């Protein structure tokens, strides 16, 4: 691969910039695990396909893709991730006996630091025929090593925000030279942005692989802890995944909801439990009385606020709720997962900021499966209306299931693309 002199010089400089940075990173608590592997001192075994998943969410997608590929073809797979949480998910959900018969289980490793000399040694050791990058895993040292090795590069389930594109375009010539062979983006907008960044790559769209992972809730589950804490006939409103930047408007929402929906019980779920102390102060200053979830043994009184301080109970709260607001959306934070309430028959209400979930599609609003409020006041009106109307939960679940089912198939599409670069594919085995 012939590189322009400017890129060669920048690569040399980039490699040396890492020298003073590495000792600092070694002390970073999030990078301590697997640090020798990150340095390339513990090399993975060779693999035909290398799949990189940034963290926990992408780790599940990587597992699904690896399973599907190994069912279709006898190939060796390396799964890598940046985070300890991602590594734990990969190991937990892919035990030794999980691979198809006569297949070598995928190897799991931490993704190397992007120092070009480290990446070159790791790519030489692994020798992948196909590199799969999930969503937006774009690292110059990594891409350069892959290009020099002759490996085919695929970016699947691709997402690229306008803000990220602006940052990458500071040096458009670099990314044009390092572009993947093919990009499958999750929306036309993402595809257009990738085409701007990688004008020589093959760009198309695919269903988001995340739809393939969605499953209906267990209908045989027993009553949830949330249901046991509610007084009879009191409407229960969940405010889920509330972020730091939207605490004050959320407190205003709570006051307005208690005034608008008499007897309502509010379940307040901060996104980070480290904000519980701040919430105690905010609620006290607003003159609102609250109870900690961990201190409750019996049902609360009507009109109570439950400040949730336990992990793992948000889904059960949706099951018991009449209405739900999903945070990360009143401030420009990109939103949080609003799909889970739908699976329990609740049409979620969110604020105006949900860029991180636009991949779900604008049709989710058009089909009445998501209510988007312009501000916290409108969110209060929508939540109060949801409590008053008491729509059919079974109908919402069915509509949500149909919406999701119509958008499945991303994993299959991604697998087709990987196998296309490994060998000629008999397309009849995949169907139309």
What are these regions (language model features)?
Residues 2-36:
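A transmembrane-helix-recognition feature enriched in membrane-embedded lipid enzymes
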Residues 25-42, 46-220, 238, 242-244, ...:
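Active-site and donor-binding regions of nucleotide-sugar-utilizing enzymes
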Residues 126-130, 301-333:
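Acidic donor-binding loop of glycosyltransferase active sites
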Residues 4, 22, 255, 391-432:
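C-terminal amphipathic helix plus adjacent low-complexity
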Residues 142, 246, 313, 336-337, ...:
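Conserved sugar-transfer catalytic core signal across GT-A, GT-B, and GT-C glycosyltransferases
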Residues 118, 142, 275, 313, ...:
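Short acidic active-site motifs
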Residues 68, 73-74, 80-83, 87-89, ...:
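Donor-nucleotide binding loops and adjacent catalytic segments primarily
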Residues 180, 319-402:
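Catalytic binding pocket for nucleotide-activated donors in carbohydrate/polymer assembly enzymes
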């Amino acid at each position: 691969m012939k590189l322009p002199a400017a890129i060669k010089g920048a690569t040399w400089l980039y490699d040396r910039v890492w020298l003073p940075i590495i000792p600092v990173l070694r002390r970073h608590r999030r990078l301590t695990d697997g640090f020798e592997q990150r340095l390339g001192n513990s090399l993975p075994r060779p693999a035909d396909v290398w799949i990189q998943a940034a963290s926990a969410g992408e780790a599940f997608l990587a597992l699904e893709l690896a399973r599907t590929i190994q069912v279709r073809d006898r190939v060796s797979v390396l799964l890598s991730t940046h985070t300890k949480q991602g590594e734990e998910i990969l190991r937990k959900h892919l035990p030794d006996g999980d691979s198809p018969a006569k297949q070598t289980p995928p190897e799991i490793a931490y993704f190397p630091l992007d120092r070009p000399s480290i990446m070159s040694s790791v790519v030489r050791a692994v020798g992948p025929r196909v590199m799969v990058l999930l969503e937006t895993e774009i690292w110059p040292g990594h891409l350069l090593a892959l290009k020099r090795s002759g490996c085919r590069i695929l970016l699947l389930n691709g997402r690229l925000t306008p803000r990220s594109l602006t940052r990458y375009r500071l040096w458009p010539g670099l990314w044009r030279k390092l572009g993947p062979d093919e990009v499958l983006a999750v929306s036309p907008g993402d595809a257009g942005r990738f085409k701007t960044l990688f004008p020589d790559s093959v760009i198309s769209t695919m269903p988001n692989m995340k739809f393939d992972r969605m499953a209906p809730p267990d209908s045989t589950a027993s009553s949830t802890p949330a249901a046991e804490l509610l007084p009879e006939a009191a409407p229960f409103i969940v405010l889920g995944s509330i972020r730091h930047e939207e605490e004050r408007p959320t407190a205003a929402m709570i006051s307005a909801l208690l005034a608008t929906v008499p007897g309502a019980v509010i379940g307040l779920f901060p996104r980070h439990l480290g904000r519980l102390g701040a919430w105690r102060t905010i609620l006290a200053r607003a003159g609102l009385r609250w109870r900690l979830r961990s201190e409750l043994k019996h049902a609360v009184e009507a009109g109570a606020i439950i400040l949730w301080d336990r992990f793992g109970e948000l889904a059960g709260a949706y099951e018991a709720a009449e209405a739900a607001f999903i945070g990360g959306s009143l401030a420009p934070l990109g939103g949080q997962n609003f799909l889970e309430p739908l699976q329990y028959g609740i049409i979620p209400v969110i604020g105006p900021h949900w860029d991180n979930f636009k991949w779900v599609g604008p049709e989710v609003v058009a089909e009445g499966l998501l209510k988007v409020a312009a501000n916290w006041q409108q969110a209060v009106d929508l939540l109060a209306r949801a409590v008053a109307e008491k729509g059919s939960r079974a109908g919402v679940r069915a509509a949500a299931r149909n919406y999701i089912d119509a958008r499945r198939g991303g994993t299959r599409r991604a697998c087709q693309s990987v196998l296309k670069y490994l060998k000629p594919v008999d397309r009849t085995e995949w169907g139309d």
